Swiss-Prot record:
Organism: Petrotoga mobilis (strain DSM 10674 / SJ95)
Keyword Membrane: no
Protein name (record): Large ribosomal subunit protein bL33
Any single biological process term in GO: translation
Keywords in alphabetical order: Ribonucleoprotein, Ribosomal protein
GO MF, one example: structural constituent of ribosome
InterPro entries: Ribosomal_bL33, Ribosomal_bL33_sf, Ribosomal_zn-bd
Stretches of the chain forming a coiled coil according to its record: none
Length: 54
C-alpha cells in the first residue's frame, strides 16, 4: 500500500464575502492555519484570507 502524501491541498477563503478565491498546497506537518492578505475580486480590495477545507 502506498504511503500517504505529505502535501495537502486547501483553499483560501475571504473573511468578508466568504468566497474561496485561491487554492494552495502545504506540508501536512504544518499544523497552524494560514492567514494571508490577498486580493479578493468579488470585494475588489485586499482582504484577509484564511485557510479552509476544499
Amino acid at each position: 500500500m502506498a504511503a500517504k502524501s505529505q502535501i495537502i491541498e486547501f483553499s483560501l477563503k475571504c473573511t468578508e464575502c466568504n468566497n474561496r478565491n485561491y487554492y494552495k498546497k502545504k506540508n501536512r506537518n504544518y499544523k497552524e492555519k494560514i492567514e494571508l492578505k490577498k486580493y479578493c475580486p468579488h470585494c475588489r480590495k485586499h482582504t484577509l484570507h484564511v485557510e479552509s477545507k476544499i
